[in-house]
Amino acid sequence: MPLSYQHFRKLLLLDDGTEAGPLEEELPRLADADLNRRVAEDLNLGNLNVSIPWTHKVGNFTGLYSSTVPIFNPEWQTPSFPNIHLQEDIINRCQQFVGPLTVNEKRRLKLIMPARFYPTHTKYLPLDKGIKPYYPDQVVNHYFQTRHYLHTLWKAGILYKRETTRSASFCGSPYSWEQELQHGRLVIKTSQRHGDESFCSQPSGILSRSSVGPCIRSQLKQSRLGLQPHQGPLASSQPGRSGSIRARVHPSTRRYFGVEPSGSGHIDHSVNNSSSCLHQSAVRKAAYSHLSTSKRQSSSGHAVEFHCLPPNSAGSQSQGSVSSCWWLQFRNSKPCSEYCLSHLVNLREDWGPCDEHGEHHIRIPRTPARVTGGVFLVDKNPHNTAESRLVVDFSQFSRGITRVSWPKFAVPNLQSLTNLLSSNLSWLSLDVSAAFYHIPLHPAAMPHLLIGSSGLSRYVARLSSNSRINNNQYGTMQNLHDSCSRQLYVSLMLLYKTYGWKLHLYSHPIVLGFRKIPMGVGLSPFLLAQFTSAICSVVRRAFPHCLAFSYMDDVVLGAKSVQHREALYTAVTNFLLSLGIHLNPNKTKRWGYSLNFMGYIIGSWGTLPQDHIVQKIKHCFRKLPVNRPIDWKVCQRIVGLLGFAAPFTQCGYPALMPLYACIQAKQAFTFSPTYKAFLSKQYMNLYPVARQRPGLCQVFADATPTGWGLAIGHQRMRGTFVAPLPIHTAELLAACFARSRSGAKLIGTDNSVVLSRKYTSFPWLLGCAANWILRGTSFVYVPSALNPADDPSRGRLGLYRPLLRLPFQPTTGRTSLYAVSPSVPSHLPVRVHFASPLHVAWRPP
């Protein structure tokens, strides 16, 4: 029996020299409220109101009033993203691989093809809030690093770029729902004056890069500024035409290309064909001599200028007037000091495009030039500080009026995980690179998930105290130099070494929407869990003699032998690659027979916490002060750590109840030396959580408030309590007696609280003792009417109810491991091919 009762009494200072009686007498005493109160006073557990100042730091745990200053690393590398494109016909591909899919798998895969996110309310924030001033001392560096990260994501096809209110561009391969289809092709009609030629029609409905300019641009709407001339060659099919074509287009939206906030006083995105800025040189003047340009000034001071160029002219590096671009204005202005930005701008002739456009353009719902969340950079993870990670804050969808309730999904609990994975298989884990960015998002969700930036000029102006943003005169010469400062100049000079001409590109405003699911939204983990669990379900059915399991982006494969595992690895890797799932082969880990997963080590003997967690716990106890009140926020962090390992201790969660109580009361907690010693002893020896075995229940327990009864095989026992007890307490005591009398690992009971194995609501001492006694016991529910122990508990020993045949099947929780599936047709070839086309990195020792 696991509990030495005297030992428990000594541990909790209950022993006053008297010899402990039998368990049936002693255990009910632990439920006594008076004894629990005395022990709490002895251990100083209940004294929450203290006058001594609280301690706000214990080891690495910080509590209230502590601000950890984030550290910015100017050397951060932006991680590279593979060209991730999940195959659209993923369901068909899975069916070719494994035969018909189950309803469950189909439903999950349809959820993510494409994912949809349509909240009822969305708050739009000004572009200035797009990049958070998370590092006040490194504003400019952080701005450019973040812009570079966003540019990388856009290039990798993870973001859309807002081009106009109703159109966006992106890179990478398009999905069918991203095409603008009109009878199977994209058709834009010009006005009657040019005849009814429909141009730019490509059967696929996807615009190629070469024709992108004119098509979208032909939709230039009539703005408040009056009619604008239209630019450029009509289509790639009519290369010779040049000159200015005034297209009469439908007056609907007021703004076209720029994303400059409407109050900022100028629209600075030129509408250009090859989307690049000109060389400010003689070439420019030569090329511009034969252009017809038109410039109109509006009452509000907006200047908008469009040019028309022959496609092959020398000036196809065209752009709007220099005056519309904050960066290039410095070229023609007099330096205001030795730290004037004009020195930097004059360093190179060609600053590249003001604006880049993607390979494909699509229609989107009306999208304002605003953001719905801010972004900033942090270390990729505590072990990798060389690379950065983008944090996207869409917290508006978790609070206030814009709150969205996220779908719940099952997380395997410790016992289910052990039942499932504790086996004598050889394991490896796969690393899915950028797992979230595999799942495509419908373009209609774009207006709700916007990130971006207002451009360097406004960002710097907003943060520097000496300059005001004046709506009516912003962008004019007198305050162009307001942003010049030594700090900005030095930062930009250093950044110029890294980014070169891209400094100009990144200094323009931009609005981006997500094309794949972002990490900062509660929907994403749910979708990722659905996706990987469906894929694993398919893999398990294709290889019934192996085990594949996933939690989020952590996928593990188990097989009987190492050779078998490697063959399985090859086959599964090929299958995942064919679906468009990107694996990182360098991060594939081969664990052998004990698997590291979700913070646990799982072997055939059961489950234990991983070593780094055990070390953290030891460190925590070393640093834990006694007789000093510890702030409840620190206690919360301590409980988080200890709670993870609690199932591996003898007393389990109930031992932490005094700490939980103080956190709930938001009071400080003082560790007495005895309580600290008790906890420390609990956590120094961790016992594995073993796998439950199926079996037949032979032992039953039942209780009434006044007595208890047991049925052990054909033997019946009964007893009475000294005083009536609450029914749940009585049932728990009966279960403890059944375990200690019979040693059975399987007990039948009709009480749901005992079945749940959560003993935190009982009197503290009883909860600890019961957890100790019942550790490793499995319970089976038996209805009261059929419970053989029912009669003995009511004091009737003469009546024998026949023993039930109650089989026990260990549960794997709601991890829906084996979706019930139609049988796989027998003519499918066996799928583990030993002669693999993929070379396995593993070599025999």
Curated annotation (Swiss-Prot):
Residues 1-179 are annotated as: Terminal protein domain (TP). Activated by host HSP70 and HSP40 in vitro to be able to bind the epsilon loop of the pgRNA. Because deletion of the RNase H region renders the protein partly chaperone-independent, the chaperones may be needed indirectly to relieve occlusion of the RNA-binding site by this domain. Inhibited by several reverse-transcriptase inhibitors: Lamivudine, Adefovir and Entecavir. One of its GO terms (molecular function) is DNA binding. The record marks 65 as: Priming of reverse-transcription by covalently linking the first nucleotide of the (-)DNA. It catalyses: DNA(n) + a 2'-deoxyribonucleoside 5'-triphosphate = DNA(n+1) + diphosphate; Endonucleolytic cleavage to 5'-phosphomonoester. The keyword Glycoprotein does not apply. Mg(2+) binds at residues 431, 553-554. InterPro entries: DNA/RNA_pol_sf, DNApol_viral_C, DNApol_viral_N, HBV_DPOL, Rev_trsase/Diguanyl_cyclase, RT_dom, Viral_Replic_Matur_Polypro. Keywords: DNA replication, DNA-binding, DNA-directed DNA polymerase, Endonuclease, Host-virus interaction, Hydrolase, Inhibition of host innate immune response by virus, Inhibition of host RLR pathway by virus, Magnesium, Metal-binding, Multifunctional enzyme, Nuclease, Nucleotidyltransferase, RNA-directed DNA polymerase, Transferase, Viral immunoevasion. Residues 180-348 are annotated as: Spacer. Residues 349-692 are annotated as: Polymerase/reverse transcriptase domain (RT). Residues 359-602 form the Reverse transcriptase domain. Its EC number is 2.7.7.7, 2.7.7.49, 3.1.26.4. Belongs to the hepadnaviridae P protein family. Terminal protein domain (TP) is hepadnavirus-specific. Spacer domain is highly variable and separates the TP and RT domains. Polymerase/reverse-transcriptase domain (RT) and ribonuclease H domain (RH) are similar to retrovirus reverse transcriptase/RNase H. This is Protein P. It comes from Hepatitis B virus genotype A2 (isolate Japan/11D11HCCW/1998).
